[in-house]
Amino acid sequence: MKPEDYAWNEFERTSYKTKINRLPSPYKVAIWDDSEKRLELEQILERLPQKELARWALENSRDFLSLIDIGDEGEKNKIIRQTYEAFDARLRNEFSPHELRKAGFTANLLSKNAQNQIAKYAARVFVQAISTAHMRGHAIVSADYAIKVRNLQEVDKLELVRQEREKQIRLAEFFLGNEKYKR
């Protein structure tokens, strides 16, 4: 794929051109995980152009929106709606990376104002997904936060972690399959 499709950020584009991307990427979130499934996911995500990767991350975050609790459902929905609009504008190249980052900071209020740990990390799944429209590296962090939520929901349940990773992989394969048909 062309470097400009792979990454919109110059640093990530240069890493792609010089082939210095290493998988698996280091964890940025402390989680109990199936590292083989995570690597499998990353290998698929690596083949998606950034626009599709961002769409994948946002779609992957949808199941976690209902877990976000900031004590004010109206405010939560307003923040999510505004952030979605900024994300879509960025994908249409109508928003600069800076404007998207500002929207991401607003979305981060969902995490800061969370009423419990599950709500906090569910919000981070969403915030990192939105940020994928700025930098690719946020996609795997979003996916890892999804695993963090599953860790909190059921302590010591590796099967729940595997199910979540398999769901992420199926969704990524769907996006990869759709990308092939676009060409």
Language model features with spans:
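Structured binding/interaction patches within domain cores
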Residues: 2-164
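Mature, well-folded catalytic/scaffold domains that follow N-terminal targeting or propeptide regions
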Residues: 153, 157-158, 173-183
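A recognition module on extended beta-rich or small alphabeta surfaces enriched in W/G with H and D/E
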Residues: 163-175
